[in-house]
Amino acid sequence: DSGATSTAPGTIATITQTAAKPVISASVSGTSYKVKITSKTSGAVIYYTTDGSEPNAAYSKGTRYTGAFTVSPGKTVKAVAVCNKYADSSVSSKKLAKLTTYKITFKSNGGKGSMSKQSMAKGVSTAISKNKFSRKYYTFTGWNTKANGKGKSYKNKAKIKLTKNITLYAQWK
């Protein structure tokens, strides 16, 4: 937005206020980041980029912000706020750190079917994937870090924080 306002012919409007610089916040969601952007300027429209480039004056390089979005680790989010009767804000920037990820390997432990490995960011509470194994004449009772059930037990879809790669074995009764 150029900030131009309608004035009487022959007069020049002076812009005295600048839109508030956007605030970029990010939280880890799975193995990515969930990004939210806000501006304290009422009615401001926010444009952003995720490749580190500047959301330029014509906004041809920016995407209009309409709500939270997901971004891969290692990216840089930049944003600018624009509003009628205001000068454009300065550009905000947030570098999203690379995440250490760990994997859960699922073993059927006598059951049938398959499950893909599940990736989780280090130290982030994430639900274990829902069991997809089956075993004729048996009921799935949860997961365990040992095939014999004498390790650490987890309920189906329980939230856990990983600090290393683990293998979970389906438990049956």
Task: Describe the role of every protein-language-model region.
Residues D1-G3, G43-I46, N84-S90, V124-A158:
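Surface-exposed interfaces of beta-sheet-rich extracellular modules
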Residues P55, G113, G149-K152:
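Flexible, glycine-rich phosphate/dinucleotide-binding loops
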Residues T14-I15, A97-K107, F133, K152-K173:
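Conserved "repeat-terminator" motif of extracellular CCP/Sushi domains
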Residues S29, V35, F69-P73, N109-T141, ...:
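Extracellular modular ligand-binding repeats in secreted and cell-surface proteins
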Residues A58-T63, S116-K117, Y154:
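Short acidic, glycine/proline-rich loop/turn micro-motifs
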Residues D1-I104, G110-G111, I160:
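Short, compositionally stereotyped local motifs that mark structural "simplifiers"
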Residues T38, T49-D51, N56, K107, ...:
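Residue-level detector of conserved, well-ordered beta-strand and adjacent loop positions
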